[in-house]
């Protein structure tokens, strides 16, 4: 699945879909596969293709779920796309939920509300 997620993100961004449809909300599972790890290569590809915006800018138009192991992988995705583009994700609630949920406070509320365009009264 990580390959498919990586290809999907690259296709959406390099294909200009996010630029043509700026209000389109796409949430990619598992932190986008290997996209954070390969971002620099895709950035070079975007430059070679002559895209109007950078790969990094368009990457931040997507949403990513946090269904990753805690640690370096999660940290890399957050540093690549920003905490404000992360939402909580899990396959089976409970057994794979992070032990420390405080890192996901913003993802569990504010970001999910934005992504789902829900009304919110604080």
PLM features: residue spans?
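Mid-to-C-terminal alpha-helical segments outside catalytic/metal-binding sites
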Residues: 24, 34, 64, 71-87, ...
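Short, flexible loop segments at the rims of nucleotide/cofactor-binding pockets, characterized by
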Residues: 3-5, 63-67
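Histidine/acidic residue-rich metal-binding segments in metalloenzymes
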Residues: 1-57, 72-84
């Amino acid at each position: 699945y990580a390959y498919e997620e990586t290809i999907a993100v690259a296709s959406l961004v390099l294909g200009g879909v996010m630029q043509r449809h700026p209000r389109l909300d796409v949430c990619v599972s598992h932190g986008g596969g290997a996209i954070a790890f390969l971002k620099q290569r895709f950035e070079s590809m975007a430059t070679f293709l002559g895209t109007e915006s950078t790969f990094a800018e368009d990457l931040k138009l997507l949403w990513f779920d946090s269904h990753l192991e805690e640690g370096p992988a999660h940290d890399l995705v957050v540093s690549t796309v920003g905490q404000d583009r992360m939402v909580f994700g899990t396959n089976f609630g409970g057994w794979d939920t992070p032990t420390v949920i405080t890192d996901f406070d913003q993802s569990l509320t504010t970001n999910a509300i934005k992504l789902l365009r829900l009304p919110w009264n604080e």
